[in-house]
């Protein structure tokens, strides 16, 4: 199912309801994102004459860490399978300096988009690809004698990794004994009897680690060189010994890739990134510049000016082709403790017309976060201990006390929002998680007294609270 179909089925109200399954509160932020998403679908239905005039209304989320800014954007992208990329504004540097180039956020988005499209296309060719992969696997498990004897290799072929070793041609005679053997292997393969057997397969070698390392150091300009070098020579292959189970996956991906048109994949990936893509720029408050800040402030303003043309709409070159950023939805977020949105350059402020202030989490919110979402923390710890054969039970009073402690610690020290619950629960259940394999009990109940016993000594010592919780 494509993302356009998914968006067609989901109204803004339904999108908010889906977000409620994972995120507590922040109704205003959820509504704004849901409307922005629905507007993209509405735009697709318009006449081409007016469609090009309608650009997404970018969103600026303002609120302390841990209240759900990133999670809202991440979940919304998952719900509609839209290309989504998260970047941190502090990782970028002004053009001409060592560091990440702001254009890399668009390249990252296109990579995600192409991967999403490829996954969908692989599902369309799955039946044929699996059949082809199975045939190759059977030939690897029962090779012909003629193929076994062919060991000579051209020296240049050895240098550049060679081409795929051809399977025997359809015209090649296969004796009856080999046919019978392959028939037996096919039956055993389909019944999973050979899944743990070892087989040797040829896989593409990873790209040059030196180029990878240089890219990791922030040299995004190495992308073009890397792609140019990789296109000059055939993909180098190496032999790996893997289980039949792994070989099935490797050969399936290889066969599926052969059935997918690379040009069509790139074109559709770019189109989806342009029309449906979302880029989440976190920590944008850290590049807000204030008067009298010296060289550091000048550099921050330079990053803002580099981001501006991308948000406004510009043509960015990627290895798949040129991307127009005009219709990409940008969601920026920041705590704005030390600065305010008006400290951003006016041109950039104007490109984020929708501003949402997210609420600080209350004690009641903490209680709901612990119990209501589909991926609630308490459910996660229950599932972890269930693997040891232990049923972990939390009383209502215990959960209320955990929520109270989390809220109190956030009030007394740095407010890190819902992330505080991770720290508190890990400290609370530390001994239990350590001793679980040796505990001979079917169930363990966490009560309010247990919570007080484990956390009260730390709560009473303010210095310890700051370091441990």
Curated annotation (Swiss-Prot):
GO cellular component entries: HslUV protease complex
Any GO MF annotation of the entry: proteasome-activating activity
Primary subcellular site in the record, as a coarse category: cytoplasm
UniProt keyword list: ATP-binding, Chaperone, Cytoplasm, Nucleotide-binding
Oligomer status and interactors: A double ring-shaped homohexamer of HslV is capped on each side by a ring-shaped HslU homohexamer. The assembly of the HslU/HslV complex is dependent on binding of ATP.
Family recorded in the similarity comment: Belongs to the ClpX chaperone family. HslU subfamily.
Name under which the protein is recorded: ATP-dependent protease ATPase subunit HslU
Organism expressing this protein natively: Listeria monocytogenes serotype 4b (strain CLIP80459)
Lineage: Bacteria, Bacillati, Bacillota, Bacilli, Bacillales
């Amino acid at each position: 199912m494509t993302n356009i179909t998914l968006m067609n089925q989901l109204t803004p109200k339904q999108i908010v309801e889906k977000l409620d399954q994972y995120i507590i509160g922040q109704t205003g932020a959820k509504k704004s994102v849901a409307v922005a998403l629905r507007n993209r679908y509405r735009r697709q239905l318009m006449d081409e004459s007016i469609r090009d005039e309608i650009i997404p209304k970018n969103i600026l989320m303002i609120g302390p860490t841990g209240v759900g800014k990133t999670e809202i954007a991440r979940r919304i992208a998952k719900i509609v399978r839209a290309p989504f990329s998260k970047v941190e504004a502090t990782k970028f540097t002004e053009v001409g300096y060592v560091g990440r180039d702001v254009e890399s956020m668009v390249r990252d988005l296109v990579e995600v988009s192409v991967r999403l499209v490829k996954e969908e296309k692989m599902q369309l060719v799955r039946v044929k690809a699996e059949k082809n992969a199975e045939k190759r696997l059977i030939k690897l498990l029962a090779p012909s004698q003629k193929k076994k004897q062919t060991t000579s290799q051209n020296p240049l072929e050895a240098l550049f990794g060679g081409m795929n070793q051809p399977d025997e041609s359809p015209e090649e005679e296969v004796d009856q004994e080999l046919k019978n053997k392959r028939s037996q292997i096919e039956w055993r393969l389909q019944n999973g009897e050979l899944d743990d057997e070892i087989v040797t397969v040829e896989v593409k070698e990873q790209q040059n680690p030196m180029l990878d390392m240089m890219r990791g150091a922030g040299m995004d300009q190495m992308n073009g060189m890397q792609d140019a070098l990789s296109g000059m020579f055939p993909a180098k292959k190496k032999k790996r010994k893997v289980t039949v189970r792994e070989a099935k996956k490797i050969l399936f991906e290889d066969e599926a890739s052969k059935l997918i048109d690379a040009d069509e994949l790139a074109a559709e990936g770019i189109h989806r990134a342009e029309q449906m893509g979302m880029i989440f720029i976190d920590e944008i408050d850290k590049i807000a510049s204030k008067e009298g800040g010296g060289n550091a402030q000048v550099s921050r303003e330079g990053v803002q000016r580099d981001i501006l043309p991308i948000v406004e709409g510009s043509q960015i070159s990627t290895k798949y082709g040129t991307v127009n950023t005009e219709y990409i939805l940008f969601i920026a977020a920041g705590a704005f403790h030390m600065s305010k949105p008006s400290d951003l350059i006016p041109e950039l402020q104007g490109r984020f017309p929708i501003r949402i202030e997210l609420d600080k989490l209350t004690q009641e919110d903490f209680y709901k976060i612990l119990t209501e979402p589909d991926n609630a923390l308490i459910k996660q710890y229950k599932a972890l201990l269930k693997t040891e054969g232990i049923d972990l039970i939390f009383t209502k009073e215990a959960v209320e006390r955990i929520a109270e402690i989390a809220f109190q610690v956030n009030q007394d020290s740095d407010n890190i929002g819902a992330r505080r619950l991770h720290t508190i629960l890990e400290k609370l259940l530390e001994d239990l998680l350590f001793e679980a394999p040796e505990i001979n009990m079917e169930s363990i109940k966490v009560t309010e007294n247990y919570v007080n016993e484990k956390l009260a000594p730390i709560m009473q010592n303010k210095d310890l609270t700051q370091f441990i919780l």
